[in-house]
């Protein structure tokens, strides 16, 4: 016989070597949709109880980006892995549909017509816009291979959801936490609405930095400072000159020392610790500190406004610091949180004479009609004109900007609705829950959100917009006071649920259908009312999702086991959800919170259109396939910022190819195995038993990593298993047994049985990450061998049995592997010298001490095959020749390597001293001859 290759049992499978992910993935999506893979996965799980991951709703505006893709893939990995571990882990995707970005887009489309249209018409356009992008994003998320209840998502604009949101506001009212008052809040002049803390982002901004003197003409100055009031001044520093028209006081710290500094015949009061730096700023070369007094003694002195004829008293405040400025703080209660609190303590007027565009009203001398930022240079000019400007500089500092339009915001006192943080100990209870009731992943998230809530102001929940859930309240036309009642609010909320477009009911229903019969204002007795036009903060919308979703749907539960979002949500959804739940339920809405970082480019830079480094998910999908995007998510420690580049993706393509090829090899070598020929673990070849032990250990590490959300460990363990443990060792050793042994021989069936078990464990472990490929592999397992599951995600633990060897057996194999590594080293010099080309060309003698020799012999397997050599002997260590390879890693071992004697079998390539004993099979060894004769090969 001349062509022995045809007699080998080479791998045979229809599973393609080339992935062609971009073409095959859409086909797989159709398959999943056809069998309802999500339902099949759900039906197969639940034995261990329920596990709830609650989806933080992305905004229904625009296409998805890499950050949202990362987030959805992470959630998908959690849901799939938990289901495959036996939990009923459902995924209900959600969308945040209300708010400013959508309303802005609609305003741009409507132009000037928007002002003429009733609110419900504008809201209809907003709803249509949200629906459009919700459908777009749903398709894009499904393209990532994410399974979920896509046909039954939750939407914040759904009538039932809007009703639940309004009902939660009623619950807060019933608890007494909702107040309406005039306070300084973040205000965007461009968007013309109040902003919450979570809607403010900080960017570098250049502002004017000015030092201003206030006349201190109070007669009491003579007694307190021992100087003539006619020559006395108090000096402030500010970076917001536009707030000076609304100055009502100057604040000093009661415990700081304040100096009286004489310069050019005048006396200036400022913090003693800042005299030197201030004098340098002012250009004072000759000045003298004539006295110092504690700040507490300055309280009650009355300064005069620098350009208006009105008093500006000196007040005390603990927040005054000495790290910059003068230690004397310009106080405008209408434009700062701390200023406001000080104003309340001292009964100061809360001035904020601005319209919604940030323009000064006609009542403001010198600056009427100017925007606040237009007013800055005019205020400085006025100060210079009256002689009260001591110094002017520019300063670059971190300044609040609107999250939507990215423009600088201001603090402005307006009448708003708030959730009071101190009422019913809301703040204290939230802080306690953070410390005691929630697991934060990473752990630093606990401190971050704790600090945010510990120092946050009352929650401003009102917005001066149209597209959102209206604040259910009535305003008295007589006195302007508001009225609402929890029971009435709940009744209105119930009507929202029954209305086809939810809270459009508030806008479409005439006033008489809203106002309770005979309602009189409790403040003035009036009976003329109008509806509140403010809407709820969208963070209140999404923050009450625990009520609208977790408590309402049968496939979820309250509280959730996990909230998983980007780290910016410590001040966003995690934050608002916690306050909303603690305020009305008394418990947090989640048991654990996991955060991921931001996606950055390969150099660690934030993605920016101006830099030109933005990568869209669709670009990656079109080039590599969604599977590579999923592998990228799993390959990184997502808790930090995550880098992505073509180089990174190319490396992952190589890693993916190695995993795929391993699966293909496994499939190719079980093609002729039948269920009846599966070998029990107890009688399998010892090497096969050990291989299953390796895979079982890897499986345990992978499942632990899934449980701890350490997906990068899943990837690395999976990759190492395929590349190192399987391809480089076990599968390499098996080739002779699989290819050259008799087709139905016990040793070959043992190997095939091991490969089947390994393959089933492999597809189960890789499915949450490499979902497309795992399903493809699963579908290519011969039907008779494939577990009866509709989809790979429906595999149960019983479908993938796990096996371990004894600790003694494991110890023996660890010794074998250590020796195998040393044998490879010992052969290398001969390979380099050209004496041998392959390890099968060698005869190896292991000179081992008694302990090692006994361990090696006790394996009960053919070590020659394990080391992939043609001949192997074990000899006493003391017989080792002088030139034997001495191992540094394995004690009691030396290795002799020589060219294998005899000739190479033309079929199995193993050297034998006798070949061709059967004339019908010249060049074949005895083993191969027997196989050929038995099989009838000619």
Swiss-Prot record:
* Placement of sequence motif 'KMSKS' region: 606-610
The highest taxon in the source lineage is Bacteria
Arranged from A to Z, the UniProt key words for this protein are: Aminoacyl-tRNA synthetase, ATP-binding, Cytoplasm, Ligase, Metal-binding, Nucleotide-binding, Protein biosynthesis, Zinc
Query: Which InterPro entries does the UniProt record give?
Result: aa-tRNA-synth_I_CS, aa-tRNA-synth_Ia, Anticodon_Ile_BEm, Ile-tRNA-ligase, Ile-tRNA-ligase_type1, Ile-tRNA_ligase, M/V/L/I-tRNA-synth_anticd-bd, Rossmann-like_a/b/a_fold
EC number(s) per UniProt? 6.1.1.5
Q: What are its GO biological-process terms?
A: isoleucyl-tRNA aminoacylation
Subunit text: Monomer.
The family assignment reads: Belongs to the class-I aminoacyl-tRNA synthetase family. IleS type 1 subfamily.
Biological role stated in the UniProt entry: Catalyzes the attachment of isoleucine to tRNA(Ile). As IleRS can inadvertently accommodate and process structurally similar amino acids such as valine, to avoid such errors it has two additional distinct tRNA(Ile)-dependent editing activities. One activity is designated as 'pretransfer' editing and involves the hydrolysis of activated Val-AMP. The other activity is designated 'posttransfer' editing and involves deacylation of mischarged Val-tRNA(Ile).
Protein name per Swiss-Prot or TrEMBL: Isoleucine--tRNA ligase
Q: What's the encoding gene here?
A: ileS
